[in-house]
């Protein structure tokens, strides 16, 4: 996870062999990333980039047959996997539609299927829910959880809700570096005692807090302006500890510390 430009997509392109690392070592299951090993690595990986064009004039099924063939999947395995994943993604009834006729969410689901056709050990997905409506976002997140039962799933996002709903482990990037890598619970623990509820009476008091602290939420209420203030120490006498820390609170606290 990280803001736009943090380096998430670049890292994924290195992991999928689209880009070559300029320094350091990368390995997958003990296999070092170098040109002699790229073919072995690619067979272990399924990849869905943030933007993918899947042949608008082909039907869903035709597109998947073609993509599976490029991955070297046998005809029998390919037929079984396409049938299975079309059902798993609720696309069976749409398999004879042209790709250009699909919604954005449906196209992402087809993209997920193509990434799974070679039965990868490692599924890498860049921004899986970008541009999707809330219902499709939930559907994609649930699919990722299902797929993670028997493989490693790595996805990038700047949407905190995606992580909160799907992950137990996460890494946070900023300007090409890792600020954190570990459990979700560990990140929440890091912000413990540093999230405060504060209700101020007017906009001037609110501006003063915003000038000196990170604010994770702000809401106008009947008796003033309610704010969640992130600080190691108590910001002012009106602030009380917030013990209901969200992943968004913890993320903002870490990235702005």
Name each model feature, range by range.
Residues 16:
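Helix-to-loop junction immediately C-terminal to a conserved catalytic motif
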Residues 24-34, 40-41:
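Conserved ABC transporter NBD signature motif
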Residues 98-102:
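Conserved ABC ATPase signature
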Residues 123-127:
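Catalytic Walker B motif of ABC-type/P-loop ATPase nucleotide-binding domains
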Residues 65, 69, 76-94:
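Conserved ABC ATPase "signature" region
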Residues 3-7:
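Walker A (P-loop) phosphate-binding loop of ABC-type ATPase nucleotide-binding domains
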Residues 139-228:
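ABC transporter nucleotide-binding domain
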